């Protein structure tokens, strides 16, 4: 029995029961190889499509045209603004957050000291750890 006849018999559930063990195993093997083969071919096809899309969408390096007269190089950039400016902004943001949490105006608060916490775990992370430890016993 050739493979096409075997696969025709294999397509009908009633005729599968009448097949001999060798023919049944051959049909199973052909079905597995066809299924896996089609899957591998489809995945390879998708791989090439995605690779092509990545190549099309990738940014191409911009070509810089050299001018005859070289532009003078700029001097060193000015130093960034002092950190005190950023600290004032940070205090203002913290004051606004505390005021929003307390439901009051930021002008009603006096912030005397702002220090960084040693534990950098977010509050939800600490709450999860406490919850796990509480339910452990």
Curated annotation (Swiss-Prot):
It is found in: Cell membrane. GO terms for molecular function: decarboxylation-driven active transmembrane transporter activity; sodium ion transmembrane transporter activity. It comes from the Bacteria. It comes from Propionigenium modestum. It is a single-pass membrane protein. It catalyses: (S)-methylmalonyl-CoA + Na(+)(in) + H(+)(out) = propanoyl-CoA + Na(+)(out) + CO2. Belongs to the OadG family. Pfam families: OAD_gamma (PF04277). Its main location: membrane. Subunit of the sodium ion pump methylmalonyl-CoA decarboxylase, which converts the chemical energy of a decarboxylation reaction into an electrochemical gradient of Na(+) ions across the cytoplasmic membrane, thereby creating a sodium ion motive force that is used for ATP synthesis. The delta subunit is required for catalytic activity as well as for the proper assembly of the individual subunits to an enzyme complex. The chain crosses the membrane at residues 30-50. This is Methylmalonyl-CoA decarboxylase subunit delta. Keywords: Cell membrane, Ion transport, Membrane, Sodium, Sodium transport, Translocase, Transmembrane, Transmembrane helix, Transport. GO terms for biological process: sodium ion export across plasma membrane. GO terms for cellular component: plasma membrane.
């Amino acid at each position: 029995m050739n493979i096409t006849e075997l696969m025709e018999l294999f397509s009908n559930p009633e005729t599968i029961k009448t097949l001999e063990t060798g023919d049944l195993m051959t049909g199973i093997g052909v079905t597995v190889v066809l299924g896996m083969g089609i899957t591998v071919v489809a995945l390879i096809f998708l791989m090439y499509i995605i690779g092509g899309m990545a190549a099309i969408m990738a940014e191409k390096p911009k070509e810089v045209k050299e001018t005859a007269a070289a532009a003078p190089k700029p001097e060193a950039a000015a130093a960034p603004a002092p950190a005190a400016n950023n600290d004032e902004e940070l205090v203002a943001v913290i004051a606004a957050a505390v005021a929003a949490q307390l439901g009051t105006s930021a002008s009603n608060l006096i912030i005397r000291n702002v220090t960084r916490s040693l534990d950098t775990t977010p509050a939800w992370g600490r709450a999860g750890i406490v919850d796990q430890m509480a339910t452990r016993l």
